[in-house]
Design a protein with these regions (language model features):
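N-terminal lobe/hinge region of extracytoplasmic solute-binding protein
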Residues: 69-123, 154, 226-227
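Aromatic- and charge-enriched surface segment that lines or borders ligand/interaction sites
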Residues: 117-162, 176, 182-184, 276-278, ...
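Surface-exposed binding/hinge segments that line
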Residues: 131, 165-210, 235-237
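Local pocket/hinge segments that shape ligand/substrate recognition
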Residues: 71, 166, 196, 255, ...
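Gly/Pro-rich hinge or "lid" segments in bacterial periplasmic/extracellular proteins
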Residues: 102-106, 199-254, 261, 269, ...
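A structural "hinge/loop" feature
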Residues: 72-91, 115, 142, 192-202, ...
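Ligand-site clamp/hinge motif
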Residues: 219, 249-295, 424
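Detector for C-terminal structural segments
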Residues: 13, 237-241, 246, 336-367, ...
Length: 560
């Protein structure tokens, strides 16, 4: 029986028209306005086992863990400190949010309840009341209630680290009663409900009891975790594997098919990752190299399924304290890059070139934007205009190959293209995310060019645009490692957040994309397809384009 996957097709990849303006949903299970539509009928067919088969299969599967090979381990288990996708692979075993993206049987994505049963929104879209579940406890026995939510949100905002970028300016978080919490915003924030799928709830008791020198438990929570989720952190051997075991008191219970343990196995070498999956030593593999997909699809017991994504591959350029501070030089580099060699050669044509900073599939995409294409003569003319007719300077290209198998070859293409402009480029690969992030946040010593994989975790363009390009998110708070700061661009982003109508917001985002294309803070190199690679014994895994690749572990079970 094939893995139970829901193949999500994104309408905007095929239609130029954008979604009709619709206000943010104010009740559970309302369909998302993402450009996501019903999967083809054949992709939805699944073979349902009989009850007897389920019991037998579940008992057999309980004898071994679900093994998921990942290219990188979490930076930290503290979701208020770092919530990039690799961190969330571990964090979402243990932690949950108030709201979640759900996938319906017909393949549509919507906002649904998790720790909040329902919510109410004021007419001015500034006040939200979340009604919480009454049957939830953290795994250390601490009650999950309104006080716990208040503490979590206030901690998240007080830390002022990158995950706080997901939440708008909050005027107050108030406890209405034990199981109702009121959040008052300083101004309307169009994607607020979608953004509430991101803050994960930590046990206040665990964090407070391990606080050191006012760090709100950060140090302890780096390697420890106490949440309301289906699993508890059992062990973590850095650089090797993270193991989580069932939370026996999990509020959804353990009837039906589930796994007792989950192992995140760190495998950075692409060939090794493929061999482990082929041998049946792993059940799911993340980020398999495209070179291996054709062979894997023919391997016995292996399933390869496409999941169209909003994932973009960007090469961002430092806009301060280097020759790249001149936008004409950045434009020249954007024209010099060989997009076709990268997309068709390295990515095996399993990607397309974006028009700009917003991916295909987003309702905010400016379909009239003209992308940069390779034009070496134009690139050389811009270099001469900027005062660098022969190049004559040196840059560092910073990569993290463990995050993307394609990065070494992508860097070599860019290095060669820069050489054509007389720019000497040195490639510097970082071994882990913490080191990588530390360097791009250093204004003086950071690399001139770095690779960044952007992923839409919610159905709203502000999520990535703000943290990558807004002036407020340079340095420690964000990932604006290009140090791009433009008052007009900031103003457009800020204004778009306060408008409920998508049609009105889109006009602002169209203007914004024109500015970014002209300023060229990044080379928008490719929008990749995504492929789910698993063993055919894996059941219950549902593909979701938001929070790309992070499973709902509770739903997973194994048929052997």
């Amino acid at each position: 029986m094939r893995t139970k996957l829901v193949l999500l097709m994104i309408v905007a990849l095929f239609l130029a028209a954008c979604s009709a303006p619709t206000p943010e949903p104010a009740a559970p299970q309302e369909e998302s306005k993402a450009a996501v539509t019903e999967a083809p009928a054949e992709a939805q067919k699944t073979e349902e086992p009989t009850e007897a088969e389920k019991v037998a299969e579940s008992a057999e599967a309980a004898s071994r863990p679900f093994v998921f090979t990942v290219r990188q381990e979490p930076v930290t288990m503290d979701p208020h400190v770092n919530d990039l996708s690799y961190s969330q692979y571990g964090q979402r075993l243990v932690y949950e949010a108030l709201i979640e993206y759900t996938v319906s049987p017909d393949g549509k994505v919507g906002l649904g309840p998790r720790l909040a049963e329902s919510w109410d929104v004021s007419d001015d879209a500034k006040t939200y009341v979340f009604n919480l579940r009454k049957d939830v406890k953290f795994s250390d026995g601490t009650p999950f209630n309104a006080e716990a939510v208040k503490w979590n949100l206030e901690r998240l905002l007080a830390l002022k680290l990158p995950p706080s970028a997901r939440i708008p300016p909050v005027d107050s978080v108030d406890v209405v009663d034990d199981y109702s919490v009121k959040i008052v915003l300083k101004s309307p924030f169009a994607p607020f409900l979608a953004s509430m799928t991101l803050p994960l709830m930590i046990s206040p008791t665990a964090a407070q009891s391990h606080e050191e020198e006012g760090d709100m438990g950060q140090k302890w929570l780096t390697d420890n975790a106490v949440g309301t989720g289906p699993y508890m952190l059992e062990s973590w051997v850095r650089g090797q594997e993270l193991t989580a075991t069932r939370n026996p008191d999990y509020w959804r219970g353990w009837e039906g098919n589930h796994v007792d343990k989950v192992v995140l196995q760190v495998v950075q070498e692409p060939t090794t990752q493929r061999l482990i999956l082929e041998a049946g030593e792993a059940d799911l593999a993340d980020n398999i190299a495209f070179d291996d997909l054709d062979a894997l699809s023919q391997a016995p017991g292996v399933v390869v399924e496409p999941g169209i994504s909003l994932e973009m591959l960007n090469m961002c350029m430092k806009t301060v304290e280097s020759p790249l501070a001149d936008k004409r030089v950045r434009q020249a580099v954007s024209y010099a890059f060989d997009y076709d060699s990268f997309i068709n050669g390295v990515l095996n044509s399993r990607a397309q070139q974006p028009l700009g900073p917003v991916p295909f599939g987003s309702w905010a995409l400016d379909q009239d934007l003209q992308p940069y294409t390779r034009d070496l003569e134009k690139a050389k003319a811009l270099m001469a205009e900027a005062g660098y007719p022969d190049g004559g300077f040196k840059v560092t290209i910073q990569t993290i190959a463990a995050y993307g198998w394609y990065q070494p070859r992508e860097a070599q293409i860019l290095q060669q293209n820069l050489g054509e402009l007389g720019i000497e480029a040195v490639i510097d690969d970082k071994a882990d995310a913490a080191t990588f992030l530390g360097t791009i946040r250093d204004k003086e010593k950071g690399p001139e060019i770095y690779f960044w994989r952007s992923v839409a975790a919610i159905d709203d363009p502000d999520y990535e645009l703000r943290r990558m390009y807004h002036s407020d998110f340079v340095g420690e708070r964000g990932v604006n490692g290009s140090w791009f700061q433009d008052p007009k661009a900031d103003e457009l982003l800020d204004k778009a957040l306060t408008i409920p109508s998508r049609e009105e917001r889109k006009s602002l985002y169209d203007e914004y994309q024109v500015i970014l294309k002209d300023e060229a803070p990044c080379i928008w190199a490719a929008q990749m397809n995504y492929y789910i690679t698993s063993r055919d014994v894996l059941k219950g895994y549902v593909w979701n384009p938001f929070n790309i690749g992070v499973p709902d572990y509770y739903q997973i079970w194994l048929s052997e």
